[in-house]
Amino acid sequence: QMCIRDSKKGYQFSSANSINIGRLVPQIVYYVYAYAKLLANGEIKDGEKINVVVPTGNFGNILAAFYAKNMGLPINKFICASNENKVLYDFFTTGEYDRNREFVLTTSPSMDILISSNLERLIYRIAGNNAAKNAELMASLKSEGKYKITEEMKAQLADFYGNYATEAEDAATIKKIYEDCGYVIDTHTSVAATVYDKYRKETGDTTKTVIASTASPYKFTRSVMNAIDSKYDSMGDFELVDELSKISNVKVPNAIEEIRTAPVLHDTVCDSDKMCDEVKKILGI
């Protein structure tokens, strides 16, 4: 980020990850589309509320659902699903956000996050759009690695439910859904499915629910296939891709298929403290 901020050389950089509002705005459409499909299929009545379950680390996709509700979409509950990096679960449970903890490498790496960037946008809303209060909390996060919201702010999170899935639970859910339904889900969607199961058992809520499946199993083939059966452990990467296609009856995506014969274009490796120098070298500045 420090490198991105260096504009003295005439270059302007932008981030394309989920902190960019350009990612959040199209994601709002997911939930409107899902609601429209439920209506079209006769699953719900017009105006009937639904729940949404989102596997998240950076709080982007679920924030898009929150914005969709603010635009009028009938959503009852936002179910926030975390992996073992459960900083969001702890936040919704206690009202304290604390990143001072061990970072866990999991099989759902897109959720391996301890600083959930988009949560700041939700904090701003529950602080009554108070920019000064928001800045105060974010300053505490930067200096102390944590902050705590007020009871009044916490009361505004009643529509949110947080829980998490362990690595073992994640793998077990992938296996169970495949065996029960013949459907293969990825490691992130499995976190969501696991947490939804916990939510149902805790609350008994039978509201029609949409689980956001945020990734393809082809992105995490080894973790997915190993969860289904240990016999796949010894297979090579592309053998696993072919096996996944067979058991899921889903064609290998072109982007994956092309990798088999594609030349390696980028082979630069550097230490994190050398990243800025490497970017400058590539740009010739």
What residue spans do the PLM features occupy?
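Short, small-residue-biased leader/transition segments that mark boundaries at the very start
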Residues: 2-4
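Active-site-adjacent helical/loop segments in soluble small-molecule enzymes
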Residues: 8-42, 46-49, 125-203, 262-268
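Electropositive phosphate-/nucleotide-binding environments in soluble metabolic enzymes
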Residues: 21-29, 59, 112-116, 120, ...
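Glycine-rich phosphate/pyrophosphate-binding loop at beta-loop-alpha junctions
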Residues: 43-46, 51-140, 212-228
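Catalytic phosphate/nucleotide-handling subdomain of diverse soluble enzymes
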Residues: 73-92, 194-261
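Exposed alpha-helical structural elements
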Residues: 87, 121, 132-137, 169, ...
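Non-catalytic terminal extensions of PLP-dependent enzymes
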Residues: 145-149, 234-285
